[in-house]
Amino acid sequence: LHGSSAASDVYKRQGVCGLITPWNWPVNQITAKVGPALAAGCTMVLKPSEIAPLNAILFAEVMEEAGTPPGVFNLVNGDGPTVGVALSSHPDIDMMSFTGSTRAGISVAQESAVTVKRVTQELGGKSANIILEDADFEKAIARDTFGMCMNTGQSCNAPTRMLVPASRMAEAAEIARAAAEQIAVGDPNDEDTKVGPLVSEVQFNKVQALIQKGIDEGATLETGGVGRPDGLDKGYFVKPTVFSNVSNDMTI
């Protein structure tokens, strides 16, 4: 307090929120955005990934059955260049919450800037695990190799890079190779399967190209490689793949 002046915080709802969710963890990402928005008293328009729309449709049915008032939760299916841009640029949307690729995130930020929306984003990246000299290498590296393949490697927090002391790199590579070769790839309905297919042909081709790029740029292929696993002649299945001797100037 200074004389007759006072400072105060006022908490109020943001208004109408535009929510764009990815395909890799659809139900998780929908609830992570819708729940807080509802709790804060906001209305919302959800645009799920066009690759994984069914989860959002089921979620919308649950919301209706739960008695959500009309107009509070709204679902619009479509792709990013049409529905995503329409939401981000719409003058009646007060806030955008986006999870997905950096490329699409840039578009959301640019379109939202025209109407000075509040924007929150979680964008894709490469997660690195730093394994120090005194760590239990057998346990840590095997765990992280399995973790990298969880959800078919389609997670923003998948430990796709392991940074280890140079003196123990060969040991680490051998542990990772052995762990990767134990991972069963196949039909997700089979209880013995640990890794299913990638989500789409686009992702399959992208991953195959990255594996080939790693080979072409001189990384050491410890196991896996291009092509489908043995016994799988169709579908978007990828071999669990481990590279060593990877430098920062390589694409992978």
Say what each PLM segment does.
Residues 1-7, 11:
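Single conserved hydrophobic/aromatic residue that forms the stacking wall/gate
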Residues 9-60:
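Substrate-binding/gating loop at the entrance of the active-site cleft, primarily
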Residues 16, 70-73:
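Short acidic capping loops at alpha-helix termini that bridge into adjacent secondary structure
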Residues 24, 31, 80-86, 100-107:
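Beta-loop-alpha module in the N-terminal Rossmann-like domain of NAD(P)-dependent dehydrogenases
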Residues 30-38, 63, 112, 144, ...:
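Short hydrophobic alpha-helical segments of the AMP-binding
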Residues 46-62, 75-82, 132-135:
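ATP-dependent adenylate-forming carboxylate-activation enzymes
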Residues 74-97:
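A structured beta-alpha segment of the ubiquitous adenosine-cofactor-binding alpha/beta core
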Residues 95, 103-251:
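ALDH superfamily catalytic-core signature
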